[in-house]
């Protein structure tokens, strides 16, 4: 499928990937559009967090039942991400994005009319089924367009713009909740999806030529999934990405309890958490883009993990010495997200680089593993830890330690494979007289 609208690729009759591989820059707005697609999932999580108390009151649901609307979203999100990439590899990037974002918009509008908590669970599941397409396909598009340092720069630009989502979403949701009630955040999500659908229809180029499309045959998909998900180096780096993010996401999931109960802020005060996190993500992404091509990937990762380790240790120390309060209870979030944003573009490229034409499917597997862990954190870990800021700090440190272990194992695996001697050719068969 060719790009529509006034893009250079559409006018020339070639795909955008052919242009950028030839050296022509991608359109100026492509980073913003890909970031907006990737941010749709976080917006679906964070926008309605300030409405949790009213949702429970209006739908006669317990706090735990309201919390499970997050799990109802995250678990289908994780499962469906396995298919978004395969569909995008077979049908093209553009078509999959358009359908998925439109379905997300309809589900969001339906959430606004829910009358029982069970209805909201079901509709949130539909949101989860469709929301992951933007995140998966946007990563594949980056690798369709660029290689090496340019890919890292574009990934860093997307991460930097994507950083606004966790900060803006609860802020917007808090103001909507104050003026219009709990249904208004879902109306906002529907309008956002409608705007994105129109923007993608007019501006998003197709970056996967028809001759590079992959099969949807079950046997082919099963063998490819098995190959990707049984590769240790892929699992190590995906585990590192997922665990690093989970250390921060634990606070996002616990935001109503952490901010409103422990720190005593109002429903419009969620910027106390998401402001430092946004600033950290922006700073780390900017640094990652600046050092691309100048600092090696291992050194970039070392700097990112150094910042995250400093933040996690400082968080433990502050919680041991001081009672919960502002600003010290949220200050470590800035350094943690800064280190995370510095590391994640490099880790993502490590995950996708080996798979060539199967990048969409590999991106699906990576997103699935991250979303599955997010679902576990939402369903089990966050409710277990959010009753104490010390427990939350310990959770962040523990998840980071596991993520650092995954990155270390990946580095050792890659180093071992690079140093291994090439396989010796087998001798030719002996001819029999």
Q: Where do the language-model regions lie?
A:
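Helix-loop-helix hairpin linking two adjacent transmembrane segments in secondary transporters
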Residues: 119, 156-202
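Conserved MFS/SLC helix-loop-helix module at the cytosolic interface between two early adjacent transmembrane helices
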Residues: 79-118
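Juxtamembrane intracellular "pre-TM" segments in multi-pass secondary transporters
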Residues: 18-23, 207-238
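Paired small-residue
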Residues: 103, 107-110, 118-126, 327-333
